Amino acid sequence: VFIMLNKKLLNEILAKYDVKIKKYDHFILAMSHSSYANEHNVSSNERIEFLGDAVLGMLVARYIYENFPFLPEGKMSKLRATYVCENANAKYAKELQIDKLLLLGRGEELSGGRQKDAIINDAFESFLGALYLTNGLDDVKKVLEKLVFPHIKANDQIEFIDYKSLLQEYVQSETRASLVYKAVSYTHLRAHETGAYL
């Protein structure tokens, strides 16, 4: 069964941020997980995710630069990493209801792919990439102003803990060793689980 993007829900989501779109091509691509793409012989969201990740990182960096004038560079990077990471992005994605827009293959759907942070994170970045290509940077900023920036302003970082960075910092403070990351399982040729080794 070939499932199409829920355009009605997409428009309802965008309306909350005072955003309107006329073209859906980029959003169909953005919501097409590799499992869906493989089943239907279409392109997946991997390339547009790359773009969305860059747009998100740049706009958050600019927000931090403009709103935290006395923060040194290292702490600016740490602050950005707290609010632009898989855990945080998955929370933003759920608030946006991107999990309901996702196009997944049958196997991924049955294995609970709609609830997996890694998949939802990728879809969130892809969504931002699609919005950037469709409407430009200003509309991406409109979404982030309501969805992401308030968390940074409130500094409610307990909600968004970047466990990978915490582990790295602990290891570096306690030992001279460095962590090595290795993929331990795969789904549709993409790393699904990663182990950290000393």
Feature-to-residue mapping (PLM):
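Double-stranded RNA-binding/processing signature
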Residues: V1-A196
